[in-house]
């Protein structure tokens, strides 16, 4: 019995020391709560966390002090992480759209060297996700909370070629576009 308890503690400790995540503070607001004696002020923080290898999450936290609000938001973000398959480890597999409330976000995969073309909160999500080339546009609500939720909604809808092939009962090679690999003309002339 004691051995099993030690093993559990060891697992929990190992989980806490798991890969370190990068985090980005997106927004911080002063909030107030009206009580009988007046107003109590506090702070709300919005944080995006990711491993820059395809995992990302966001969280919000409220507290009387800024560092505590950021800590709470970071903890929530780590608990709510999602995994997104990236094409060539740098961009999205296909164009997608996400919605939340009055906010709509359109995300498009981009050729190598394009960079991250995204505004404010969306840029933080893509950087923490590890995307290097993407073009995105937010339409409607510019509220950072809505923009991040809409971006996450779109990312959850992404389908990797493997999952599409599995649904269709085909091979991954049949799904991906074919690229002709013809030898360069200079090599054939010399030979």
UniProtKB/Swiss-Prot annotation:
Residues 21-84 form the S5 DRBM domain. The keyword Ribonucleoprotein applies. One of its GO terms (biological process) is translation. Keywords: Ribonucleoprotein, Ribosomal protein, RNA-binding, rRNA-binding. GO terms for molecular function: rRNA binding; structural constituent of ribosome. Residues 181-191 have a biased composition (Low complexity). GO terms for cellular component: small ribosomal subunit. InterPro entries: Ribosomal_Su5_D2-typ_SF, Ribosomal_uS5, Ribosomal_uS5_bac-type, Ribosomal_uS5_C, Ribosomal_uS5_N, Ribosomal_uS5_N_CS, Ribsml_uS5_D2-typ_fold_subgr. It holds the Pfam family Ribosomal_S5_C. Residues 155-191 are annotated as: Disordered. Belongs to the universal ribosomal protein uS5 family. The N-terminal domain interacts with the head of the 30S subunit; the C-terminal domain interacts with the body and contacts protein S4. The interaction surface between S4 and S5 is involved in control of translational fidelity. Part of the 30S ribosomal subunit. Contacts proteins S4 and S8. With S4 and S12 plays an important role in translational accuracy. Located at the back of the 30S subunit body where it stabilizes the conformation of the head with respect to the body. This is Small ribosomal subunit protein uS5. It comes from Roseobacter denitrificans (strain ATCC 33942 / OCh 114). The lineage of its organism: Bacteria, Pseudomonadati, Pseudomonadota, Alphaproteobacteria, Rhodobacterales. The gene is rpsE.
